[in-house]
A protein has these predicted regions:
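Leloir-type glycosyltransferase catalytic cores
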Residues: 17, 134, 394-445
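N-terminal signal-anchor transmembrane helix specifying type II single-pass membrane topology
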Residues: 2-54
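Catalytic donor nucleotide-activated moiety binding site of glycosyltransferases and closely related
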Residues: 293, 299-347
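Donor nucleotide-activated moiety binding/catalytic core segment of transferases
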Residues: 8-12, 328-363
Length: 445
C-alpha cells in the first residue's frame, strides 16, 4: 500500500487546480501588502512602524528615545507662529522617534524691532519641566548638555520651492527615520527654512496635545493675572457708578476683543481678500463694534478689553480712537487706559508682551477675534479644548458656556451678530489655524 505522502500522490496533489489557485492567491496577497506598505497614504503608519522598531531601546521613555536628538534652526516671527513652529518641530522629532533639543525662540518680530532680534531660550517663556511632564510619552524636550558628542551630527537639509511637495517631504522624513546608518548619529540637525514653513503632516489634535503642554512661566502668568485684576477692578468701579440707578447681580462680564484694524493689517487683509476672492477677512471698526454689541445674551454693563496694536493707542483724534463708538453698557479699556502699558507690558520684549496678552484673552468670559488671525485662532483652539473637557462639544445653542468665542469678521445666525466659533478638532492639518479660514462654525467636530 502506498503511503499518503508517497512521491506519486504528492506529484498528483501539486498538479491539482486547487493547489495552483491557492499558490497564486498567496502570491497576490503578498504583492498587495508590499505595494500597500509603500503607498503615500500609509506614510504616517510606516512612521509608526519605524518608531516601534526603536521602542525596545533602553534609553527610551514611553517610546520616545532620550539618547537620540533632533536640532532645529532658531524659531522666528510672532508668538503664535513661533508656537506653531515649535509644535511642528516636536512632531517631526516624534515621527523620527527622537527628543527635540530645546530651540531658541525670538524676542521680537524681525521686521519691527531689528535691534531686538535676539534669541530667547524656550524656558524663558514656557516651563521646561512642566512641558516634559505633561507631554511624557508623546513628545520630549532636552537641553544641549544632554548631548554626549556634539561632533556626531548629521545635517538634514529641508527642501524648498514648488517642486518640494508634501509627499516628497514626508518621504524624506521616512528615509531619515528608517536609514540605520543615519539613525546611528546622536543628533540630526535640520538646516534651512524656519519650522513654521515646513510641510504639515499632523492633525489638529496632535498639535493641540503639544500646545496643552506649553505652559507659560510663572512670571508671565502673574503679569497676566495683574492685567485681568485691573480689568475686573475697572468693571467694579463702573458698577459702583450705576448701583444708585439699578442693582446688578453677580460679577460684571469681561469680554476680550482681538481688534485687528491697524494699517499694516488692513493692507495685508485687503490683499488676502483679493487673492482668495473672499470678502470676509477685513472688518472695520464700525462692523466690529456692531457685531460685538449684538452678541446674544450679553449682560450690561460689560467690560471690554481691547487687545490692539500699540499704534492704535496713540490716536489723537477722538473719532478714530478704539475707545469711542461702543453702545451703551459696553465699557472699553485697552492697555493705556488701564494703566498697564508701561507698568507691565513696557518692561518686556515683543514676544513676552504677546504672551501676556494671549493669557489675558484666554481668561476672558467671552473672546471675540478674527478667524484669519493666528493669534485669535490659537486662543479659540485652547478655549475649545477647555470646553470639550467640560463636555461641551459645540456652542451652537444659547446657554452657559464659560469658554464661548466668536469671529467678528464672519456673520452669525442673524443679521449684525458675530459667528460662534469653536475649532474643528477633526481637521487633518493645521492649515485653517496657520493661515485662517472663513469656514468656521460653532461645532468642534
Amino acid at each position: 500500500m502506498n503511503s499518503p505522502l508517497s512521491g506519486k500522490n504528492w506529484r498528483l496533489f501539486l498538479k491539482s487546480v486547487a493547489c495552483k489557485c491557492l499558490v497564486l492567491f498567496g502570491i497576490a496577497l503578498f504583492y498587495r501588502a508590499l505595494l500597500f506598505s509603500y503607498s503615500p497614504r500609509n506614510a504616517l503608519s510606516n512612521g509608526s512602524l519605524i518608531r516601534a522598531r526603536h521602542m525596545s531601546d533602553s534609553s527610551s521613555t514611553s517610546g520616545i528615545r532620550t539618547d537620540k536628538f533632533l536640532e532645529v534652526p532658531q524659531i522666528v516671527w510672532g508668538l503664535n507662529n513661533q508656537k506653531i513652529a515649535f509644535a511642528r518641530a516636536c512632531l517631526t522629532a516624534r515621527m523620527m522617534n527622537r527628543t527635540l533639543l530645546m530651540p531658541s525662540l525670538s524676542a521680537s518680530l524681525f521686521y519691527k524691532e531689528l535691534d531686538k532680534l535676539r534669541p530667547i531660550p524656550f524656558d524663558k517663556v514656557f516651563q521646561f519641566e512642566r512641558f516634559n511632564s505633561l507631554c511624557s510619552g508623546f513628545v520630549g524636550l532636552a537641553r544641549f548638555e544632554n548631548v554626549r558628542n556634539r561632533a556626531q551630527v548629521f545635517d538634514l537639509e529641508k527642501g524648498s520651492g514648488r517642486r518640494w511637495t508634501v509627499e516628497r517631504d514626508l518621504e524624506q522624513l521616512k528615509h531619515f527615520a528608517s536609514n540605520e546608518s543615519i539613525d546611528e548619529f546622536e543628533v540630526i540637525r535640520v538646516t534651512g527654512k524656519n519650522p513654521f514653513l515646513w510641510h504639515d503632516h499632523w492633525s489638529v489634535e496632535d498639535y493641540a496635545k503639544v500646545f496643552e503642554c506649553m505652559v507659560v512661566v510663572d512670571e508671565i502668568s502673574r503679569e497676566a493675572d495683574r492685567v485681568v485684576m485691573k480689568i475686573r477692578e475697572a468693571g467694579e468701579a463702573e458698577r459702583a457708578k450705576l448701583e444708585s440707578k439699578t442693582k446688578i447681580p453677580g460679577p460684571i462680564p469681561f469680554v476680550a476683543v482681538h481688534m485687528r484694524i491697524e494699517i499694516d493689517w488692513m493692507i495685508h487683509c485687503k490683499k488676502l481678500e483679493q487673492r482668495k476672492k473672499v470678502s470676509e477677512i477685513c472688518s472695520s471698526k464700525r462692523e466690529i463694534m456692531e457685531r460685538v454689541g449684538n452678541i446674544s445674551g450679553l449682560k450690561t454693563p460689560t467690560v471690554l478689553y481691547l487687545a490692539v496694536a500699540d499704534t492704535l493707542l496713540e490716536e489723537k483724534e477722538e473719532n478714530s480712537s478704539v475707545l469711542t463708538g461702543w453702545r451703551d453698557g459696553l465699557i472699553p479699556f485697552e492697555k493705556k487706559k488701564l494703566g498697564v502699558k508701561e507698568e507691565i507690558y513696557g518692561k518686556y520684549s515683543y514676544l513676552i508682551q504677546s504672551a501676556i496678552d494671549y493669557e489675558v484673552c484666554l481668561r476672558a468670559d467671552i473672546f471675540v477675534g478674527n478667524s484669519f488671525s493666528t493669534f485669535s485662532s490659537l486662543i479659540v483652539l485652547e478655549r475649545t479644548q477647555k470646553a470639550r473637557k467640560l463636555g461641551l462639544m459645540s456652542s451652537c445653542e444659547d446657554g452657559e458656556n464659560k469658554w464661548i468665542s466668536y469671529a467678528y469678521n464672519l456673520p452669525g445666525e442673524s443679521i449684525g451678530v458675530p459667528r460662534r466659533w469653536m475649532t474643528n478638532m477633526t481637521h487633518s492639518s493645521l492649515q485653517a489655524i496657520s493661515y485662517g479660514s472663513n469656514s468656521v462654525s460653532c461645532s468642534s467636530w
